Regions:
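Non-catalytic signal-transmission and effector/linker regions of two-component phosphorelay proteins
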Residues: 1-15
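Short, Lys/Arg-enriched segments at the junction into DNA-binding effector domains
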Residues: 10-13, 124-187, 191
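Charged docking surfaces used in two-component/phosphorelay signaling
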Residues: 25-33
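Short hydrophobic/Thr-rich beta-strand motif most characteristic of the beta2 strand and flanking loop
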Residues: 35-42, 50
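Acidic catalytic/metal-coordinating carboxylates
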Residues: 43-46, 69-72
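Active-site beta3 strand of CheY-like receiver
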Residues: 54-60, 65
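Basic, amphipathic DNA-recognition helix from helix-turn-helix-like DNA-binding domains
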Residues: 75, 79, 84-147
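Positively charged, aromatic-enriched patches within helix-turn-helix-type DNA-binding elements
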Residues: 159-236
Length: 245
């Protein structure tokens, strides 16, 4: 269950955008059976038109679509909303995956996939959105507020400000920055970040971390080409250094 702007509980709405009608119907049945409300769409342009009215809590988005492809749909959504997006792709090709992530997707699943795998990805993304509902309680152990130099982060309101200016981070960008900041000056491996931020217990794709770091740097760094806040640690991963100016 999610909450509306008045704090009242509402059924979580998942928008399924896939030109495979049979797959869309199957996913709807599975998700409805798990307590989610669903709406399906088979065309990218129609999905963009429907999104502002529906205000879904999460979007399952195929890459190969008529009208507009999934990358274009993700770009349109990200212009106005930070709604979690999970890409569904029949291609594991690096280029397609990276394009989807760069467009604003939070995660991806390669077809054919096990339903249990997709459900795990959905629940992990909704936990990130809800902040603190992780089954192992790990998220609840993180502090609600951080003040690191000129950067302020509020995990309750899901906001990050640099010099008092809102950075407008997506839920995944916020969570990535928050986890790095909690471990200030401590190098974290991509495997560790995949577990702490994305909820992958085993495996996971390092591209998820790399592309999200690139996106994050575009918003938090004064010069993304020479990052001072989210720094690369060769052979390990990344570390957070509190900004002072």
């Amino acid at each position: 269950m999610m909450q509306d702007e008045h704090g009242k509980s509402k059924q979580t709405l998942i928008m399924i955008v896939d030109d495979d009608a049979a797959l869309g119907e199957m996913l709807s049945i599975v998700l409805n059976g798990s307590g989610f409300e669903t709406v399906t769409c088979q065309d990218g342009l129609r999905a963009v038109e429907m999104f502002p009215t529906l205000h879904p809590d999460l979007v399952l988005l195929d890459i190969m679509l008529p009208g507009l492809d999934g990358v274009q749909v993700a770009q349109r959504i990200r212009q106005t909303a930070n709604t979690p997006i999970i890409m569904l792709t029949a291609k594991s090709d690096t280029t397609d995956v990276v394009k989807g992530l760069e467009a604003g997707a939070d995660d991806y699943v390669v077809k054919p996939f096990e339903v249990v795998e997709l459900m795990a990805r959905i629940k992990a993304r909704l936990r990130t959105l809800g902040m603190g509902a992780s089954s192992d309680g790990a998220a609840a152990k993180l502090p609600e507020f951080l003040h690191c130099g000129i950067l302020e982060m509020n995990r309750v309101r899901h906001t990050a400000k640099k010099n008092g200016i809102d950075l407008h981070l997506t839920p995944m960008e916020f969570e990535l920055l928050y986890v790095l900041a909690v471990h200030e000056d401590e190098p974290l491996s991509r495997t560790s970040l995949l577990k702490q931020v994305w909820g992958y217990d085993d495996g996971g794709d390092a591209k998820l971390v790399n592309v999200h770091v690139q996106r994050l740097r575009m918003k938090v760094e004064s010069n993304p080409e020479k990052p001072q806040i989210v720094q690369t640690v060769r052979g390990i991963g990344y570390k957070f250094v509190a900004p002072t100016e």
